[in-house]
């Protein structure tokens, strides 16, 4: 028997309110990455992000925009998230002048055809745990 997953991605996105986003960096990037995963943000994840960053970048599941604050001024950044609070927080933090697109989009829906081939790098940190179903 094939069991179909009922998708409700809103449940995973709605936890990211302006209040929880204020605590996000401390908890996720500080405590969780270092202590739970043994992968400190500044020592491992940020250098990995910057090493693979292109000039025209798409960030999917933007969180607070922490990683985007470290991109060169010449970079063009597009943001994709289902949560408007996250999109706004990341755009503000990264700097609106760097933001090419803010895309409110459910990752379970087809990727917008108008965006095909526009990016030379894509990142997707911390998204899988927000998706419905079992991993």
List where the protein language model places each region.
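Hydrophobic adenine-recognition pocket in adenosine-nucleotide-binding enzymes
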Residues: 127
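Conserved class I S-adenosyl-L-methionine
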Residues: 2-53, 66
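Class I SAM-dependent methyltransferase SAM/SAH-binding core
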Residues: 58-111
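Short amphipathic alpha-helix with an adjacent loop that forms part of the alpha/beta core around
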Residues: 111-117
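A conserved beta-strand element that flanks and buttresses the S-adenosyl-L-methionine
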Residues: 123
């Amino acid at each position: 028997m094939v069991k179909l997953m009922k998708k409700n991605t809103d449940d995973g996105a709605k936890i990211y309110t302006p209040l929880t986003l204020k605590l996000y960096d401390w908890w996720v990037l500080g405590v969780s990455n270092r202590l739970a995963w043994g992968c400190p943000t500044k020592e491992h994840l940020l250098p990995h992000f910057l090493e693979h960053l292109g000039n025209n970048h798409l960030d999917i599941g933007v969180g607070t925009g922490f990683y985007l604050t470290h991109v060169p001024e010449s970079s063009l950044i597009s943001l994709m998230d289902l949560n408007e609070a996250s999109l706004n927080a990341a755009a503000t933090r990264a700097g609106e002048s760097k933001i090419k697109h803010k895309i409110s989009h459910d990752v379970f829906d087809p990727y917008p055809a108008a965006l095909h081939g526009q990016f030379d790098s894509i990142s997707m940190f911390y998204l899988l745990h927000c998706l419905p179903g079992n991993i």
